[in-house]
Design a protein with these regions (language model features):
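Bacterial Sec-dependent N-terminal signal peptides
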Residues: 1-25
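Flexible, low-complexity junctional segments that flank or bridge functional domains
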Residues: 18-178, 182-198, 202-208, 216-220, ...
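Anionic group-transfer/hydrolysis microenvironments
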Residues: 152, 183, 242, 266-267, ...
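Gly/Ser/Thr-rich loop/hinge elements
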Residues: 188-236, 242, 272-279, 285, ...
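Cyclophilin-type peptidyl-prolyl cis-trans isomerase
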Residues: 247-264
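C-terminal soluble interaction/assembly domains
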Residues: 255, 264, 270-277
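Low-complexity, Gly/Ser/Thr/Pro-rich intrinsically disordered linker/tail segments
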Residues: 306-309
Length: 309
C-alpha cells in the first residue's frame, strides 16, 4: 500500500472532523513494536472489555501480521483499525508528528451533530441571547419567564467560567423555571460538571461510581449544594446524541433530582475517563482507564442515557 492510497483512504474520512495528515514513523522503532505497545496499553487499562464482549487476544492475532507486513506510515492504519474495534469515542492517538487520529464516533453523534443550531433557538427569544464564559454559555429569558442556559462545554480552561455561571444563575433566580441545554456539548471536566450541579441541590448528592479495568470502585464522593445560591424550581435538561462524556455525567446526576425532567434524544454513550500513554515511536495513545456507571450500577457506554421525554 503506497502513501498515495493511504492519503486517499483517509481523506474520505474528513467528515469526521479529524486530521489524517501522517508523519513518517521513526525508522528506529519497528511497526510491530509500535503495534504491541499500543495493544498492551489497552490490554492493561481499558475497562470495557467484558461489557463489550471483546476478546483482546483475538484482536492481537487479527492485527499482528498486518503490523509485521507494514512499511512506513502504514502502521497508522493498523493502529486506527485495531483501536477502532473498541468502538469508543474517547479513544484516539497522536502520531509522532502531533496529528490526532480518532477511529470511532458514536452513530448518534454523527446523526445529531448538525441537528442543533443556536440560530434556531434564538427565534424563541424576543431579545438576542447573551453570552458569557468566553462564549461557553448563552442565556436569556423566554416571554413566559422561563430561563434558558446553553452550556456548550464543561471544559475548565477559562477562569471566568465559574464566576460567569454563578452570575447567570443570579440573573435567572426569579424565573419560574430554567431550561438547561447540553445538546452538542461534548464534555470536559467532572469538576466543572459538579460545580454547575451544585446550584440545583437542596442537599448533598452522592456522585456516580467509577470502576477501573480491575473492577475497583472509586472512593465515595459527595457533591454539596452551592453555599451562596440555590435554584430549586423546576428544570428541564435538553440532551441529544452529541451530548457526550462529562455532559452525560451531568445528565446522569441531574436525572436524580426531583425537580429535573430530561428531554430530547439518547446521549452519545461515552462514559470512560481517558488518560494519555506515551509509547515508542513518538506516539500517544488516549484511552479510558475508568468507566462511569449509572446510579443503578449499569454501564451506559455506547448505549447512552435515554431522556425522560
Amino acid at each position: 500500500m503506497n502513501k498515495i492510497f493511504i492519503a486517499f483512504l483517509f481523506s474520505n474520512l474528513s467528515f469526521l472532523q479529524c486530521s489524517y495528515i501522517f508523519e513518517p514513523v521513526i525508522e528506529e522503532v519497528s511497526p510491530v513494536k509500535i503495534f504491541e505497545d499500543a495493544w498492551q496499553v489497552a490490554d492493561e487499562n481499558y475497562p470495557f472489555f467484558t461489557f463489550k464482549n471483546i476478546d483482546w487476544d483475538v484482536i492481537y492475532q487479527k492485527y499482528y501480521l498486518k503490523a509485521k507486513n507494514t512499511q512506513g506510515d502504514e502502521i497508522l492504519i493498523v493502529l486506527h483499525n485495531m483501536l477502532g474495534e473498541l468502538k469508543d469515542g474517547h479513544i484516539w492517538f497522536y502520531t509522532n508528528g502531533g496529528k490526532r487520529i480518532k477511529p470511532f464516533y458514536s452513530p448518534r453523534t454523527l446523526k445529531d451533530r448538525k441537528a442543533f443550531s443556536l440560530l434556531v433557538v434564538q427565534k424563541y427569544f424576543d431579545k438576542k441571547l447573551s453570552f458569557a464564559g468566553g462564549k461557553r454559555f448563552f442565556y436569556g429569558i423566554l416571554s413566559n419567564n422561563i430561563g434558558y442556559i446553553y452550556i456548550s462545554t464543561f471544559k475548565n480552561d477559562r477562569t471566568e467560567w465559574y464566576i460567569d455561571f454563578k452570575n447567570i444563575i443570579s440573573r435567572l433566580k426569579n424565573t419560574d423555571g430554567i431550561i438547561i441545554d447540553v445538546r452538542n456539548n461534548e464534555g470536559g471536566s467532572d469538576i466543572v460538571t459538579h460545580y454547575v450541579i451544585s446550584f440545583f441541590l437542596q442537599q448533598p448528592i452522592k456522585s456516580p461510581v467509577w470502576v477501573d479495568s480491575q473492577g475497583n470502585k472509586s472512593p465515595e464522593y459527595w457533591i454539596n449544594p452551592n453555599k451562596r445560591i440555590k435554584y430549586l424550581k423546576n428544570i428541564v435538561v435538553l440532551q441529544n446524541g452529541t451530548s457526550f462524556s462529562a455532559a452525560e455525567e451531568f445528565v446522569n446526576i441531574m436525572k436524580e433530582l426531583p425537580s429535573v425532567t430530561t428531554v430530547g434524544d439518547t446521549t452519545a454513550g461515552g462514559s470512560g475517563a481517558p488518560e494519555d500513554f506515551r509509547i515508542d515511536g513518538g506516539f500517544i495513545i488516549h484511552i479510558p482507564t475508568k468507566a462511569l456507571l449509572r446510579y443503578n450500577g449499569e454501564y451506559f457506554e455506547n448505549t447512552g442515557i435515554s431522556p425522560d421525554i
